[in-house]
């Protein structure tokens, strides 16, 4: 793909994602957002959670159409609304990812506030959530039957969903956090050493790399989760080799301890 000029990418975002008299996101945010969209289109990540402004699904659709006019491969991308949040997803890639989740490709970490420390759990221990994954897959399969729109939009009802876990799997995290909602949103991660993983990849010349992933796992569970994390890294590196828009994938980790962790 021939990369549009940074000026055109910034203009596309600022013309469509501004609300009222406010302009769209700042220049650096506009360029990073375009890189994330391209990463979703190329299958390097299944989805991105839009949090650059208060723009809703119609504005995000307009933005993606604007990018398409600049030569971006946005046809087939979809704006998925969940509980007042908008995600830009590639339905086919997300569906494949969720099907792998059902096969046990990822682990979950229970961080319920009632526990003294985090614990690994499997999808089989989260039967309600397993049914939810099936529901999302069914929804995405319906979307793939309608290719009439370049960029489509839909909404998923989510009144009783654990959004922390839902977003974790949709964004492609290999080890999402989960917790028992009937015990509130408190968690047991405060003052717990966390290993934070960050994956970045270069795109535009003379611009900072695009942040593909950022997630954490409790350091106490790192050894038991290492195989899943290694598989995730290997898969990401394989996908990066199948495209030509990005280069120089970098995956790093650091250990942090925080007084409180918001999920």
UniProtKB/Swiss-Prot annotation:
InterPro entries: DUF4504. It comes from the Eukaryota. It holds the Pfam family DUF4504. Belongs to the UPF0739 family. This is UPF0739 protein C1orf74 homolog. It comes from Bos taurus. The lineage of its organism: Eukaryota, Metazoa, Chordata, Craniata, Vertebrata.
């Amino acid at each position: 793909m021939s990369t549009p000029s940074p000026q055109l990418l910034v203009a596309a975002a600022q013309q469509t994602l501004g609300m009222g008299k406010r302009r769209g996101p700042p220049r650096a945010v506009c360029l990073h957002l375009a890189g994330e969209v391209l990463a979703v289109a190329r299958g390097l990540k299944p989805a991105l959670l839009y949090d650059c402004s208060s723009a809703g699904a119609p504005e995000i659709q307009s933005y993606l159409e604007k990018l398409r006019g600049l030569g971006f491969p946005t046809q087939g991308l979809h704006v998925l609304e969940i509980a007042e949040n908008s995600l830009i997803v590639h339905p086919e890639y997300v569906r494949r990812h969720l099907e792998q989740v059902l096969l046990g490709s990822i682990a979950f970490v229970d961080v319920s506030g009632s526990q003294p420390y985090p614990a690994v759990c499997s999808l089989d221990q989260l039967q309600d959530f397993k049914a939810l994954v099936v529901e999302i897959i069914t929804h995405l399969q319906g979307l793939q039957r309608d290719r009439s729109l370049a960029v489509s939009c839909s909404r998923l009802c989510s009144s009783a969903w654990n959004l922390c876990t839902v977003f974790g799997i949709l964004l492609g995290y290999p080890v999402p956090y989960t917790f028992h909602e009937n015990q509130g949103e408190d968690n047991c991660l405060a003052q717990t050493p966390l290993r934070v993983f960050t994956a970045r990849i270069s795109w535009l010349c003379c611009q900072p790399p695009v942040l593909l992933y950022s997630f954490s796992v409790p350091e106490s569970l790192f050894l038991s989760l290492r195989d899943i994390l290694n598989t995730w890294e290997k898969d990401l590196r394989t996908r990066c080799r199948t495209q030509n828009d990005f280069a120089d994938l970098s995956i790093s980790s650091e250990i942090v301890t925080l007084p409180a962790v918001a999920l």
